[in-house]
């Protein structure tokens, strides 16, 4: 009898844990980290592919992506909304992918915002902060200081909320 009750308690506990940890495909899964807060990404000014003198927005989004990354593909529409409908500059950084794949992805998705495709340039930028995978999105202020680091797929509303 005691063994049966103990087994039922354990089984109930395992089911409870499984239910709490279950996620649906539509569920947003990302984390906001403060690990990089306050780090200046000054190396962006050294890049030939981006002219920072022309950026007049209060915030800059750096989005680390690859063409083969499903969450990166999913968030393209959200990044397009941010770049077109808000006063936020979006810059993509190609990671762990070829330049030709990156160019094809940009063309296929009609991405108008700037992207850093060359590995030499992206390595210079990526060495300045901590990141663990893609997609990773960083919110910078106009002085290129990191305010937020988001690991995982993002939404436009989430970014807008964090930049209020």
Feature names for model-found ranges:
Residues 74, 84, 89-121, 134:
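Conserved segment of the thioredoxin-like fold in thiol-based oxidoreductases
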